[in-house]
Amino acid sequence: MTDSERPRISVVNDNPDFLELMSAILDEDAGYEVSLFAGERTTAAELAASAPDLLIIDLLLGGVSGWELVVLARADQRLADVPVIVCSADVAELRERTGELERIGNIHVLEKPFGVDQVTELVERLVGRAVTRTG
């Protein structure tokens, strides 16, 4: 499977360690093509340019709400149907936004901390399994 055939995942987070971890889990281990975006300055246009099959967005991006980016992504025709995983350690906020999640649609929650199996199983369910690269 070539890079262009692997499912593409764009990850937005303001924590470089988290981005490195997600790249290790999803690209190096699971075989997805991963694009990393460092936080609050990320725009929906940048995400759309990466042509993702899946978005993973943290809810708190350096003081800016990740919800804003989710809403902007949904308003962009190129991202309107792309599934989104929102990540947060703030379980209370996730519960408060349940109605909004349902209204926006195709939004999935990943509570921090999460295990490697949790994230890979959710990603597989949403975009399919990547074929592990050899060599």
Model-derived segments and spans:
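Non-catalytic signal-transmission and effector/linker regions of two-component phosphorelay proteins
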Residues: 1-10, 14-16, 115-135
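Two-component/phosphorelay signaling modules centered on CheY-like receiver
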Residues: 16-35, 104
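Residue-level signal for the "D+5" position in two-component response regulator receiver
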Residues: 36, 61-64
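Acidic catalytic/metal-coordinating carboxylates
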Residues: 39, 65-71
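Active-site beta3 strand of CheY-like receiver
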Residues: 50-57, 61
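His-Asp phosphorelay/catalytic-motif detector in bacterial-type signaling
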Residues: 51, 78-83
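Alpha4 helix (beta4-alpha4-beta5 surface) of REC/receiver domains from two-component response regulators
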Residues: 68, 91-110, 117, 121
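Hydrophobic/aromatic residues positioned on beta-strands within the core alpha/beta folds
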Residues: 87-89
